[in-house]
Amino acid sequence: MDGFDRSNAPVEYQRVEWISDIFVFGMGVCWLINYAGMIYTSLQEQTYSMAPLALCCNFAWEMVYGLIYPSKSRIEQGVFLAGLVVNLGVMYTAIRFAPNEWAHAPLVMNNITLIFALGVLGSLTGHLALAAEIGPALGYSWGAVACQLLLSVGGFCQLLGRSSSRGASYTLWLSRFIGSGCVVGFAILRYMYWSEAFNWLNSPLVLWSLGVFIAVDSLYGICLWNVKKYEHGQERSNARKAQ
């Protein structure tokens, strides 16, 4: 049974499908807020918010499952296409301002556009290869898992590497965390009420990935709070010295 084709869903799942659709809609709203927030932050602070490799992988995933292997759910398909459109702005601002973060590495700074292009191309072909290997329905989910791990770990490493809240905010963190949490919500419903197609969600690798996502994104919030606390302390100290 193909998890993409809801017309074959069992009666048990059809009864709770509206709840799943609420989670899908919530995922879309949160990620659109996140994308819009990243564009705004990039323009204000002249930097990028999402780690480049994660951004390329995520953008390519939306291309593959928004255009090439579209979902049969109109809500899900609408969410993916809306995300892809807004993500174009995220890509543009990232490419425009990324050189500001790489002045210490001229080879990277002078080839940002090429690096992003290769990142998207590599991710796009990778997602297509995965879909060809295990099928679009499973490729959609495992590709999303890869994107989420890159987003979580990449964002956390970027925060630690910058030792600054530049390009970060509580809004960006919470919208990403809650948006991905909504994915967990509808995945649980599909596993519980459509086990024939989604029994694989109980696999050790999926559960490990879920644990990494929750742990790393929770640590991100804690570290962001500490970084902002330090920055506020520095601002107060500098203000006192200026008096």
Curated annotation (Swiss-Prot):
Pfam families: Pyr4-TMTC. Pathway: Secondary metabolite biosynthesis. It is found in: Membrane. GO terms for molecular function: lyase activity. Disulfide bonds: none annotated. Its EC number is 4.2.3.-. It is a multi-pass membrane protein. InterPro entries: PaxB-like. It is an enzyme of class 4 (lyase). GO terms for cellular component: membrane. Keywords: Glycoprotein, Lyase, Membrane, Transmembrane, Transmembrane helix. The chain crosses the membrane at residues 19-39, 50-70, 75-95, 112-132, 134-154, 169-189, 205-225. Its main location: membrane. Glycans are attached at residue 111. Terpene cyclase; part of the gene cluster that mediates the biosynthesis of the indole diterpenes nodulisporic acids (NA). Nodulisporic acid A (NAA) and its chemically modified derivatives are of particular significance because of their highly potent insecticidal activity against blood-feeding arthropods and lack of observable adverse effects on mammals, in particular the tremogenicity associated with the paspaline-derived IDTs is not observed. This is Terpene cyclase nodB. It comes from Hypoxylon pulicicidum.
